C-alpha cells in the first residue's frame, strides 16, 4: 500500500520525532520559549484549536502551555504543521547530527534560497570584491590590511573634481614661481658681484622659492634626489658663465634622474598597495617615516636659503680655507655649518630602516660632511654591547638570589620536619603500654560512675517530692 500522507504531514512527523528524541542532558538545550512554540504548534496540529479550560493557579506550567496554545486561535492543522517545520528549520543547524535529524533532512530537502548576483550574472561576490581590490587605483591607501577604494559613487566624483582643482592651482603657482625665479636669476647675473650667486644653486633638489607638496601617499625619495646638486663640482669663481652652465647642466641631469627614480618608486608602491601583496603595518610605518623626512627636508631647505643669503657658505677644501690659486679649484658643496649640524641630527633621529639611505648620502667628498655619521653608529654599537653585558650581570645576580632562596626554603622545611618529629616523640610517655593517651583512658573508666551517681541523686529528689 503506497504512502498517501501529504508532504507537510510527513515533515511534521519527522520533526516531532527529532524533538522527542532529544536527550535531557544533551549538548543542545532549547529554550523555554522555543519549547512553548513547539508545544502550541503540536497541540494545534494534532487536536485543533484550544477548547479546554485554563488550569488553576496551582499549575503555573500548565497555565503557560494553555496560553501558548490558546494564542494560535483558529489556525488550521496544516498551517500548524508547516509552522512547526519552519521553526525546526531555524534550529536544525545547531542540533547534533543523529539518525532522526538525517531522516528529517532527507524529508525536508534543500531549504536554502540561492540568490544570484544581479550585477554580474555569474561569479560570486567574493570574486567580484577580489577583482575590485586588484583593479583599484593606487590612490587607495592600505591601512591595517584594508584598502580604502575611491570608487563609491558621488563621493568619488566630488573627490576627483577637488583633485583636479587642486592640480590646476598647483600648476598656476608653479608657473608663477618659475617666472619669479627666472627674473631673480637674471637680476643676479646682471650684478657685478658673484658672491650672492649661490642663492640660485639648487640645494637638495629644490630651489629657493620652491615648496614641498605633501600628498596622501608620501613616497621615499631616491638617493639621487637627496644628494646635493653642487657636490664635487669644481667651479671657478671668476667665470660666471661657466659656473651657471655647469650648475644648470648638473641640475638638469639630476632632475631627470630624480623624476625617473620617483616614477619607478611610485610604480612599485602602486603595485604593492593592496592588502594581498604587502604588510599593512610595515607600509604604514614607512609612509610615516617618509612623511617626516619630507617635512625635515622642507625645514632644512628654508634654513639653507636664509644662511646662503647671508653668505655663510663653506668651501670644500680643508678647514674651510681656499686653495693657493685664489678662486680656482673652489668646490661648492651647497651646505652651511648650521645645515650640516641640523642634517646630522635629523639623520640620527631616523629609524633603523633608513641606514642604507644615510650611508649612500654620506659618501660625499667633504672632510667634515656626511661621513661623520659613522661615528655615532659605532658609539651606538658600543652602548648596546655595554647594556647587554650589564643585563647579563643582572640576570646572573637574580639567578644567584633565586638559588640562595631555594636553599633557605629547603633548609627551613627540613628543620620544621625535624622539630615536629621530636615533639611527637616527646609527647608519648616512655613506659605507657596502651595505644591511647592516659586522659582518654581515665575518662572511659570514670564516666560510668559519674552517670550512676547522677541517676542516684535524681531518684532521691523524686522520692522526696512524692512523700
From Swiss-Prot:
Gene3D superfamilies: 1.20.80.10. Pfam families: ACBP (PF00887). GO terms for cellular component: cytoplasm; peroxisomal membrane; peroxisome. It is a single-pass membrane protein. InterPro entries: ACBD5, Acyl-CoA-binding_prot_CS, Acyl-CoA-binding_protein, Acyl-CoA-binding_sf, FERM/acyl-CoA-bd_prot_sf. An acyl-CoA binds at residues 19-28, 39-43, 65, 84. Its main location: membrane. Residues 312-322, 335-347 have a biased composition (Basic and acidic residues). It comes from the Eukaryota. SUPFAM superfamilies: Acyl-CoA binding protein. Acyl-CoA binding protein which acts as the peroxisome receptor for pexophagy but is dispensable for aggrephagy and nonselective autophagy. Binds medium- and long-chain acyl-CoA esters. Belongs to the ATG37 family. This is Acyl-CoA-binding domain-containing protein 5. It comes from Xenopus laevis. The lineage of its organism: Eukaryota, Metazoa, Chordata, Craniata, Vertebrata. The gene is acbd5.
Amino acid at each position: 500500500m503506497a504512502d498517501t500522507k501529504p508532504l507537510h504531514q510527513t515533515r511534521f512527523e519527522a520533526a516531532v520525532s527529532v524533538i522527542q528524541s532529544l536527550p535531557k542532558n544533551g549538548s543542545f538545550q532549547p529554550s523555554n520559549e522555543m519549547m512553548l512554540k513547539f508545544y502550541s504548534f503540536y497541540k494545534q496540529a494534532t487536536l485543533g484549536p484550544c477548547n479546554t479550560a485554563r488550569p488553576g493557579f496551582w499549575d503555573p506550567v500548565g497555565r503557560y502551555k494553555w496560553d501558548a496554545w490558546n494564542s494560535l486561535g483558529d489556525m488550521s492543522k496544516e498551517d500548524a504543521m508547516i509552522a512547526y517545520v519552519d521553526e525546526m528549520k531555524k534550529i536544525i543547524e545547531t542540533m547534533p547530527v543523529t539518525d532522526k535529524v538525517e531522516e528529517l533532512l532527507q524529508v525536508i530537502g534543500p531549504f536554502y534560497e540561492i540568490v544570484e548576483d544581479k550585477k554580474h550574472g555569474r561569479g560570486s561576490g567574493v570574486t567580484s570584491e577580489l577583482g575590485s581590490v586588484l583593479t583599484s587605483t593606487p590612490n587607495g591607501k592600505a591601512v591595517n590590511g584594508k584598502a580604502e577604494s575611491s570608487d563609491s559613487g558621488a563621493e568619488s566624483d566630488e573627490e576627483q573634481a577637488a583633485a583636479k582643482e587642486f592640480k590646476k592651482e598647483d600648476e598656476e603657482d608653479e608657473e608663477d614661481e618659475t617666472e619669479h625665479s627666472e627674473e631673480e636669476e637674471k637680476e643676479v647675473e646682471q650684478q657685478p658681484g658673484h658672491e650672492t650667486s649661490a642663492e640660485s644653486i639648487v640645494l637638495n633638489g629644490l630651489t629657493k622659492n620652491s615648496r614641498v607638496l605633501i600628498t596622501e601617499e608620501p613616497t621615499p625619495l631616491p638617493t639621487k634626489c637627496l644628494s646635493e646638486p653642487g657636490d664635487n663640482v669644481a667651479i671657478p669663481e671668476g667665470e660666471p658663465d661657466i659656473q651657471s652652465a655647469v650648475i644648470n647642466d648638473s641640475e638638469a641631469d639630476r632632475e631627470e634622474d630624480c623624476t625617473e627614480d620617483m616614477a619607478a618608486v611610485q610604480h612599485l608602491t602602486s603595485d604593492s598597495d593592496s592588502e594581498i601583496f604587502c604588510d599593512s603595518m610595515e607600509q604604514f610605518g614607512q609612509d610615516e617615516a617618509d612623511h617626516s623626512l619630507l617635512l625635515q627636508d622642507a625645514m632644512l631647505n628654508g634654513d639653507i636659503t636664509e644662511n646662503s643669503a647671508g653668505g655663510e657658505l663653506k668651501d670644500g677644501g680643508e678647514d674651510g680655507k681656499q686653495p693657493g690659486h685664489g678662486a680656482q679649484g673652489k668646490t661648492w658643496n651647497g651646505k652651511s655649518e648650521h645645515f650640516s649640524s641640523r642634517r646630522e641630527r635629523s639623520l640620527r633621529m631616523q629609524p633603523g630602516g633608513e641606514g642604507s639611505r644615510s650611508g649612500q648620502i654620506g659618501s660625499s667628498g667633504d672632510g667634515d660632511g656626511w661621513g661623520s655619521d659613522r661615528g655615532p653608529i659605532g658609539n651606538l654599537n658600543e652602548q648596546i654591547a655595554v647594556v647587554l653585558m650589564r643585563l647579563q650581570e643582572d640576570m646572573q645576580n637574580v639567578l644567584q638570589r633565586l638559588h640562595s632562596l631555594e636553599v633557605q626554603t629547603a633548609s627551613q622545611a627540613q628543620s620544621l620536619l625535624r622539630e615536629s618529629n621530636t615533639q611527637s616523640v616527646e609527647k608519648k610517655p616512655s613506659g605507657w603500654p596502651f595505644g591511647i593517651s592516659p586522659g582518654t583512658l581515665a575518662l572511659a573508666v570514670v564516666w560510668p560512675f559519674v552517670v550512676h551517681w547522677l541517676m542516684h541523686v535524681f531518684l532521691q529528689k523524686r522520692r522526696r517530692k512524692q512523700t
